Amino acid sequence: MGATVVIGGFFGDEGKGKIISYLAQKDNPTIVVRGGAGPNAGHTIKDGDKTFKVRMLPSGFLNKTSRVMIGPGVVVNPDVFLKEINDFATEGRSFLDNNCGIIEQHHLEADSKGRLKEKIGSTGSGTGPANAERAMRTLKMAKDIESLEKYIIDVPQELNSALDKNENILIEGTQGTHLSLWHGTYPFVTTKDVTASGICADVGVGPKRIDDVIVVFKSYLTRVGTGPMTGELSAEETSEKGWEEFGTVTGRLRRAAEFDFELASRAIMLSSANQISITKLDVRFPNCAGAQSFDELDSESKLFIKNIEDKLGVPVTLIGTGAGVNDVIDLRT
């Protein structure tokens, strides 16, 4: 038992929400906590005939026995936070730290026009302007907002107390390594570091308390908005391969390319990842859709997984074979 961190290895949209939801149900953590920048990152979760699109709460909310928390490093839109508590029926087990920054209307307006929108391709969520104001030490905090009062808790204290009791916690990263403010394709990046160390700092858990770092890669590469992307496919090529996707927050068509081993290797290095999760294997290899064991995969998809392990030197432990939360091959021992 201990702390597991899940991060994205590319440019976001790797399928972290699905993997985190699976782990939340399979490993039954006491707490699932979200780090990252803010509501600019969305996770899509399909559970049975229901599809959830989450922007503020951790994706592990489907486990009704887990408490879900937002770390102090995250900026919060109170309207989105409160709506998700209501929509996903998590009242009584949803919390945020009193030091979470607050997104206000003027942040939304600033994020939806000018350079941020036109050149960087911002999501318009207000996250960037709010984090900029936080750096200037003028941002309102969660403790200043009356409607959030009953949800406020000392998140780092809760997490570390749980670890002291040998309980299991799941730390959820957002976006992807190559959108990191420090390590990404600047200036086409987010407003925070979203590697494992950055996410842990966001929630208040020290590096010596982390047992596993799982980096999530999709079986192909996608990116929303502007910024460099090696080997980018045309819209026609993307459609022919069946790789058309749209952003959870923006609704924009995602750009696509082949799996990038150079980016993947650097993501592993930057976060000391000791496990890899590959998602959407079924999109690349339709014959493996719904597979629940490695033996069920065809030779082509097995070779794809083996090639990733051989080139990156890290074991693939979780393989997504469908849209559902439980469409996962779990190779962890």
Regions found by a protein language model. Name each.
Residues M1-T333:
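Non-transmembrane, aqueous-exposed alpha-helical and coiled segments at domain scale
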